[in-house]
Swiss-Prot record:
InterPro entries: AB_hydrolase_3, AB_hydrolase_fold, Carboxylest/Gibb_receptor. Homodimer. PANTHER family: ARYLACETAMIDE DEACETYLASE, CARBOXYLESTERASE 2-RELATED. It holds the Pfam family Abhydrolase_3. It comes from Tulipa gesneriana (Garden tulip). GO terms for cellular component: chloroplast. Keywords: Chloroplast, Lyase, Plant defense, Plastid, Transit peptide. Belongs to the AB hydrolase superfamily. The gene is TCEA1. It catalyses: 6-tuliposide A = tulipalin A + D-glucose. Its main location: plastid. The keyword Plastid applies. This is Tuliposide A-converting enzyme 1, chloroplastic.
Length: 385
C-alpha cells in the first residue's frame, strides 16, 4: 500500500494524529543532516530533555508551567512496532497512524522581554503567527518595515517556536529594525499540501489587511509600515516565499529574500547527480507532503519546469536568492535566479552564494564570519540599501 493510500484509508483525525506542530529544516544527509541547537540567545532556556522511542525533545519552563512536547502522539499501541514509512532523521510513520518526529519539535515560548508574542489568526485551523517587535520605546510612533517570514522543514517539521527560528528572528529583528511576522502553518502528512500554502497565504493576507480597515493586531497597526512589506523564508519557506509572491496583488510586496530554496526536479543537476539516495529521500518526502503531486516536476516544487507559470509574474520590486555551495539544493537556487532574470520580470534580482557551507547553516551559527556576512547582506536588502 502506498503512503498516500494508507493515509486516505484512515478516518478523519485518526487516533494518534497531532495538529502538525513539530518540525525542522530540510535535507537529511551529510551537510543537511540538520543542525544541533545552540544555547538559546535572547530566549527562554531549555531545562531538560525527554527521550522516548529514540526521540529526544527539549522541555522548557516558563514560570511554573511546562510546554508539552509535540513530537509524539499521546499513547503508543501494539501497531507502533510496524513502520509504514521511515524518513529519519525527520520522522517515522507507524501503521497505527502515530507519527514520531525526531527534529524540530522543541518550542521556545514567546518572550515578552524581547517583545515577541503569539497571535492566533484563524481559530478554525489553529494557524498562528509569532511577532517580533524591536525596541521602539524611544520612538513610539516610528513605523517599521514588515517582514513576513516562512520557516523551513520540508513541509513536515519545524515551527515558529523552534529555538533556531526564534533566536535567529529575534536577532534579525533587533539588528535590522524590522517588525517580523513568522507564520506557524499546518504540516503534512496530517495536513497535506496545499494546507501549508493556504495557511501562509492567509497569514500574508492577514498582515496586509492591517493596511486598511479595523486594527486587528496593535503592534502591526501602530508600528507597521505597509509600504514596506517584505517576504522571506528558508528551504521549504523559500519555496513558500515564491508561492506567495506569485499570487499576491501587484504593488503590495516590496521585496523577497529566498534562502536556500527547497526546489527539486525529475532530472538531477549539480550536486544531485552523485547523490541518488538524497534524490530518493526527497522524492518520498515530497510525495508524503503532496500526495496528489504530479511528481518532482510539479510547478509547486519545480518552478522552472516546462509548463510552470512564468517567473515574470513575481509580484515584487526586488529579489535576492541566497545559496550555499555545499548545499544539495544549490543548483536549484541558481536555476531559479537565472530563470527569473531571463523571464522578463522587471524587478531587480541578485544571487548571493556562500562557499564552504551547507543548507541553512546560518540558523545554527549566528556568530561565524559567513553567517555574519549573510545577515549583513540580508539586512541591507531589507533596508533597500
Amino acid at each position: 500500500m502506498s503512503v498516500a493510500s494508507f493515509f486516505s484509508s484512515l478516518p478523519a483525525r485518526p487516533f494518534g494524529y497531532k495538529d502538525g506542530r513539530g518540525r525542522t529544516g530540510m535535507v537529511p544527509t551529510t551537510d543537511i543532516g540538520r543542525r544541533m541547537v545552540k544555547p538559546p540567545v535572547l530566549a527562554c532556556r531549555p531545562i531538560e530533555s525527554n527521550t522516548y522511542h529514540g526521540s529526544v525533545t527539549s522541555v522548557f519552563l516558563t514560570k511554573s508551567s511546562r510546554s508539552p512536547s509535540p513530537s509524539l502522539s499521546p499513547t503508543p499501541t501494539a501497531l507502533d512496532d510496524e513502520i509504514v514509512l521511515d524518513l529519519k532523521p525527520f520522522l517515522i510513520i507507524y501503521k497505527s497512524g502515530r507519527i514520531e518526529r525526531f527534529l524540530g519539535t522543541t518550542v521556545i515560548p514567546a518572550c515578552p522581554e524581547v517583545a515577541t508574542k503569539d497571535v492566533v489568526i484563524d481559530p478554525a485551523t489553529g494557524v498562528s503567527v509569532r511577532l517580533y517587535l524591536p525596541n521602539v520605546v524611544d520612538l513610539p510612533s516610528k513605523k517599521l518595515p514588515v517582514l513576513v517570514y516562512f520557516h523551513g522543514g520540508g513541509f513536515v517539521i519545524e515551527n515558529t517556536g523552534s529555538p533556531n527560528y526564534h533566536n535567529y528572528l529575534t536577532l534579525l529583528a533587533a539588528k535590522a529594525g524590522v517588525l517580523i511576522v513568522s507564520i506557524n502553518y499546518r504540516l503534512a502528512p496530517e495536513y497535506p499540501l496545499p494546507a501549508s500554502y493556504d495557511d501562509c497565504m492567509a497569514g500574508f493576507n492577514w498582515v496586509v489587511s492591517h493596511s486598511a480597515g479595523p486594527a486587528l493586531e496593535p503592534w502591526l497597526a501602530q508600528h507597521g509600515d505597509f509600504s514596506q512589506i517584505l517576504l522571506s523564508g528558508d528551504s521549504a519557506g523559500g519555496n513558500v516565499t515564491h508561492y506567495v509572491a506569485m499570487r499576491a496583488d501587484a504593488g503590495v510586496i516590496e521585496g523577497v529574500a529566498i534562502v536556500h530554496p527547497y526546489f527539486l526536479g525529475s532530472e538531477p543537476v549539480g550536486n544531485e547527480i552523485n547523490d541518488p539516495a538524497n534524490i530518493e529521500f526527497h522524492d518520498k518526502l515530497w510525495r508524503l507532503a503532496a500526495p496528489d503531486t504530479e511528481g518532482l516536476d510539479d510547478p509547486l516544487i519545480n518552478p522552472v519546469a516546462p509548463g510552470a507559470p512564468s517567473l515574470a509574474g513575481l509580484k515584487c520590486k526586488r529579489a535576492v536568492v541566497f545559496v550555499a555551495g555545499n548545499d544539495f539544493l544549490v543548483e536549484r537556487g541558481r536555476m531559479y535566479y537565472e530563470a527569473l532574470v531571463k523571464s522578463g520580470w522587471r524587478g531587480e534580482a541578485e544571487l548571493v552564494q556562500h562557499e564552504g557551507v551547507g543548507h541553512v547553516f546560518h540558523l545554527s551559527d549566528y556568530s561565524g564570519d559567513i553567517s555574519v556576512a549573510m545577515m549583513t547582506k540580508l539586512i541591507a536588502f531589507l533596508k533597500g540599501e
